[in-house]
């Protein structure tokens, strides 16, 4: 869900459709262009609203599709790899994210859509694991871009030059994250079924100078909370 310019944008991944509502909940329009023709996508993995346009990332197509708020296709940005999520920082900087599952073998790729060049690659891994949790790690806090990843107890700051630890938290859960978290995501997923551990830090916001986090933990007696 994205709230911007007095509008509410909601992605329905199953229908590959973005529904657009006014700020008071009145339906206004939708972007529903699933298909194989020019300007159509096979799926929507993630979307962003930037500069009064809607950008839709399709992992399957390896493209970002740009539409106006009436659903009229504008153009595409070819990203040429498997990415789950993205963040548009400005006109010349897009952060692309893949959870250990692309051929670049970097979790973060910084791309300039104007020059069509890769600015930098960050957070290297050894093997394309082909397994995705389908979440966005990106959080914009004031003028800073922060990221939180699946099972990670640490929040990182991200720039085009580096990813570095910023905050770390201790969660008193009865089970621990296994050491193979970074080398085998699918094995980690199955190993942690039914175990009491952090799943993900899902949201960040600052109130009266205090950092607040929203997170999910699986509890053995009550499920994910």
Tell me the role of every PLM-derived stretch.
Residues 1-225:
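Eukaryotic scaffold repeat domains enriched in small/polar residues
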């Amino acid at each position: 869900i994205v709230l911007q310019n007095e509008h509410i944008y909601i992605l329905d991944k199953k229908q590959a459709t973005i529904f657009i509502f006014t700020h008071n909940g009145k339906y206004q329009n939708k972007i529903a262009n699933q298909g194989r023709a020019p300007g159509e996508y096979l799926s929507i993995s993630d979307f962003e609203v930037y500069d009064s346009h809607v950008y839709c990332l399709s992992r399957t197509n390896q493209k970002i599709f740009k539409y106006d708020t009436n659903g009229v296709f504008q153009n595409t940005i070819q990203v040429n790899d498997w990415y789950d999520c993205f963040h548009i920082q400005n006109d010349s900087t897009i952060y692309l994210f893949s959870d250990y599952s692309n051929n670049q073998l970097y979790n973060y790729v910084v791309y300039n859509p104007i020059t069509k060049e890769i600015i930098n690659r960050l957070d290297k891994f050894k093997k394309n694991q082909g397994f995705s949790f389908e979440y966005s790690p990106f959080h914009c806090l004031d003028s800073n871009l922060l990221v939180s990843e699946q099972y990670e107890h640490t929040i990182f700051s991200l720039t085009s030059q580096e990813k570095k630890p910023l905050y770390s938290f201790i969660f008193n859960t009865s089970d621990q994250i296994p050491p193979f978290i970074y080398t085998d995501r699918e094995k980690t997923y199955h190993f942690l079924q039914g175990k009491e551990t952090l799943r993900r830090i899902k949201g960040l916001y600052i109130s009266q100078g205090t950092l607040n986090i929203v997170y999910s933990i699986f509890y053995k007696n009550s499920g994910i909370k």
